[in-house]
Amino acid sequence: MLEQGESVPAVTLTDADGVDFALDVYQGKPLVVYFYPKADTPGCTNQAKDFTALADDFAAAGVPIVGISKDKPAKLKKFADKYGLRVILASDESGAACEAFGTWVEKSLYGRKYMGIERATFLIGADGAILRVWPKVKVKGHAAEVLEAVQGL
């Protein structure tokens, strides 16, 4: 997994409307990027809703929020519309961003091993360097913790 001080890799993602973009479009301002396993599942829904509840505070700090999963753009669009989400949802169908950030990892459930996205959040500085990493995120209270870090910039 990428660590504090490392540069954000050049990756192309697709937003919920099917438009391709690169994270470097946000260069020049801080950015929060969070990786989550799957849209419209309980933990991922709560996480997106928590960031949405604080969206005005992040916006006041001038910090966009991008949530990344391997879901198709159409699924992300339905997810955003269903819950009124106010974060940028991005599709990484190829897994290139997950690989580059180091969030595509071996997981284990009831003794069965499989590959999946580790829930993680990255606070990225205006210069494109990672300022802070939250690996293995527990959803409850996480968005508020990230906001506190953002407000401390």
Q: Can you name each region flagged by the protein language model?
A:
Residues M1-L153:
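Chalcogenol-based redox active-site neighborhoods
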